């Protein structure tokens, strides 16, 4: 009986082997299609399991998912996604993405370092380099950030103003020339002035004007590569590849500046830029530790030694953070003021009043503390048209973001900042440009949790005071030196996404010299009280 069973099974086995062998030999396409079907099924099942019950595409386009949408993002598509619910999702190639649109969920993500870490964008580590401090986490991030805090103290910010003002004076002349004959697009000139301001603030005059122009051109490629999700492999001559090459170019300039700055500080000279300020703090710490004498004056902060490469990578990240965001804000700011001449008039009156009619009074922090209405204008612009809409994070471990949904490990989770800044309960008529809402006792100043322009939590923007002061100083000085008109088009109010937001038509303006003597500043009244606004500003920025 057993023999008969064995004899029966052997031919059957041989038959199966023969059949499989035949298929493999003569029907390779069948095998390929079968494997493809298995991969598609796995990709789809994986997406459905990660998606759970939250809104998102019902089915994922095999393998690529929403890649085509990610290549050409629009504000309208983002906004439609936010409207689908507090949490929604998409999938692009290998990356599952969860988007949080509500304020409290966004704040929860930003304040959950044990679950998430910044990734900027999917290719961020490849472009900015994985050793960049912005990708540090936990204790390492805290220690590194401590070494940077001294660069943004009140004293340090004051020391940067002369270089910033010199850039404004230079580029205001270029603004006049750029639209001498007719209206011209100003998105690029605004990017140029911000790159120049950043380079002069960060590196002083260790970087030449020609080098600044070169850096601006290279940074355009870096920005272009910073799409939310890129093709997973870096192929030659793709956006990410060009972004990496541009990073290498910019790094060479910063490395050279760091070496020269270190040499200058070791010689005992006073710091005149952010890079020198940082190296000076290192030298002071080193001296204090080496002398180890009783009664020796202890530096305000003891920091470790940072290498030239660490310094350069840090300023690479600073330039990325400041250049795109402030370029966006400045473009919207000039456009909004041209569209609201009554607001521009109030800015001019304030600027001339605090300067007592002298437009050549140099910038100082004391002077800027008096620019209360100008500050309100800047804050309202940042609220209405926030440069950064969302901040991508990588999930380190399964993240129970709500009681009924857990974001899977290695997914990307994105807190949205826009919703909190357009909450009609806090900002009535949120689509209206109204600087008066920032009066010291107004609802806006009483709701600091909604002020999320610069993020929140342990990775909140380190240079937010610098960025706001830069915008206040620039627009304040421009208001009394320049006049400008805006040529509106059907796309003027459409938000284009290029890392940050810009007017779709790239902002058509025409500049001309302004005669400050035409402003009756002596009889003008203060919009807000200086003391009240200063106190409210501190509260809002520290929330």
Curated annotation (Swiss-Prot):
Disruption phenotype: Abolishes the production of ergosterol. Leads to susceptibility to cycloheximide and to staurosporine, but does not affect tolerance to nystatin and to amphotericin B. It is an enzyme of class 1 (oxidoreductase). Keywords: Heme, Iron, Lipid biosynthesis, Lipid metabolism, Metal-binding, Oxidoreductase, Steroid biosynthesis, Steroid metabolism, Sterol biosynthesis, Sterol metabolism, Stress response. Heme binds at residue 461. Disulfide bonds: none annotated. InterPro entries: Cyt_P450, Cyt_P450_CS, Cyt_P450_E_grp-I, Cyt_P450_sf. Pathway: Steroid metabolism; ergosterol biosynthesis. Its EC number is 1.14.19.41. It holds the Pfam family p450. GO terms for cellular component: endoplasmic reticulum. Induction: Up-regulated by sre1 in response to absence of oxygen. One of its GO terms (molecular function) is monooxygenase activity. It catalyses: 5-dehydroepisterol + NADPH + O2 + H(+) = ergosta-5,7,22,24(28)-tetraen-3beta-ol + NADP(+) + 2 H2O. Its cofactor is heme. GO terms for biological process: ergosterol biosynthetic process. Interacts with dap1. Belongs to the cytochrome P450 family. In Aspergillus, the biosynthesis pathway of the sterol precursors leading to the prevalent sterol ergosterol differs from yeast. The ringsystem of lanosterol in S.cerevisiae is firstly demethylised in three enzymatic steps leading to the intermediate zymosterol and secondly a methyl group is added to zymosterol by the sterol 24-C-methyltransferase to form fecosterol. In Aspergillus, lanosterol is firstly transmethylated by the sterol 24-C-methyltransferase leading to the intermediate eburicol and secondly demethylated in three steps to form fecosterol. The third module or late pathway involves the ergosterol synthesis itself through consecutive reactions that mainly occur in the endoplasmic reticulum (ER) membrane. Firstly, the squalene synthase erg9 catalyzes the condensation of 2 farnesyl pyrophosphate moieties to form squalene, which is the precursor of all steroids. This is C-22 sterol desaturase ERG5. It comes from Schizosaccharomyces pombe (strain 972 / ATCC 24843).
